[in-house]
Amino acid sequence: MKKGIGLGIDDFKEIIKEDCYYVDKTKFIEEIIKDGSEVKLFARPRRFGKTLNMSMLKYFFDIKNREENKEIFKDLYIEKTEAFKEQGQYPVIFLSLKDLKALTWEQMEKAIKSAISRLFSEYKYLLNDLDKFDTLTFENILLKNTELEDLKEALKFLTRILYEKYNKKVVVLIDEYDSPLVSAYINGYYEKAKDFFKTFYSTVLKDNSYLQMGVLTGIIRVIKAGIFSDLNNLSTYTILSDVYTDSYGLTEEEVEKSLKYYGIEQEISNVKDWYDGYKFGDSEVYNPWSILNFLQYKELRAYWVDTSGNDLIKDVLKKITKNTIEALERLFNGEGLKQNISGTSDLSKLLSEEELWELMLFSGYLTVEEKIDQDNYVLRLPNKEVRTLYRKTFFEKYFGRGSKLLYLMEALTENRIDEYEERLQEILLTSVSYNDTKKGNEAFYHGLIMGMGLYLEGEYITKSNIESGLGRYDFVIEPKNKAKRAYIMEFKSTDNIEKLEEVSKEALEQIENKKYDVSLKQNGVKDITYMGIAFCGKQIKISYK
């Protein structure tokens, strides 16, 4: 009988005990031990095996249940190495902040107290050995009677009492260290969160004589904001680093082996199109979450729906500019996007457009196609799965859910422009907030139209702000089959509703006067519809011919 698939299980011991299919990543333990740095931060996208690897480190190093844990590494790579002598040698603290998210700072304070109380409850056995003062401190943390200010020292306190119990330094593992910081950024209380976590992390990780090693995981490296500015003993390994490149994610060889095991090796090229394409250092890797889902359900679709990542995409769309639209368009047309990537994110202010792309890269929504020099890279969409997620997010922002978009696009491609105008007007009135359409926000309308373009991407190529004739047109939908009809659109906004029709006619005249159809005709397209589109708030008028 074939092994089961441990979908959603990120506890290493459970995966092994339940005899689930496991790709041996225990070489990571050997690399961690050989790595001389005291504190290591691994930045990888969500669902790339960070928690499973942390859980593996916990079971490997933990002095508690040493013999029992030794068994779970039987026949794995690490068992046959010199590094295996480190198994079961240290007390371990494993704190996951994955679910530490809150809408307000007050709620976050409560969540922090609960998370630390839960952590301490795993070490209640230490109470037997503590003096009165330490017992009081421990019990107050357990009962959530401690001021938040005092909790900044909680992890260091725990390392001390563990050291005193075992006379061994402590391994500290903090999973998803940045989850509460991203939540604070999205919900507007970042400075308060930063002040707490900066001290919370540095007290345990810096100048701590009870610390053997610290390992943190997250998506981003929040360093400009000063979270780790005090840590001079920190080594950071991001997706741009040349070490630990295959510790997270699956290599092609590992994916082929898994497909073969389940008798579906013929799917490799489809699987590659959908889930491959990530570049970590010099290794090309697949998204492990999606591969596990595919092995389970044997269906090619987007499995990697990640709410916090989608919040970031929505953030990009919220602050959308004409430049963002054009960049997204290039990405959707399969082109690369040149960007300066510093590898750090400053969440203390609204992200600049450049930093948004960086965040998208570290979150797994873009990947590196080519390194130009030290900080400059060409980025692209990694695969079909991510492309599908962008499209879905785009469509929901502009068109809501349901079949509105389908009917709208049918009207356009069948050249029923009056019906197209009516349907677009309805979408503007029902799906779009006033802020999006306020005066002069042409970028929003570009986004709206681009969403339509994405919908047509199988049969059409969409382009915006490209030189043709005597100027630059706003938007063109060009058919791949040159016998079909093309559409040239020019947008103008006005704050005078009575001038709506007049402005739409001006836009139409501009298309003709500036000969925007030249490049289409050169490409062999004969049938072209010219559309001048005028907006005033949520009102629209299209003049066409």
Model-inferred region functions:
Residues M1-N441, L456-K463, K482:
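Phosphate-binding site recognition
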Residues Y420-K545:
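Structural signature of nuclease core domains in nucleic-acid processing machines
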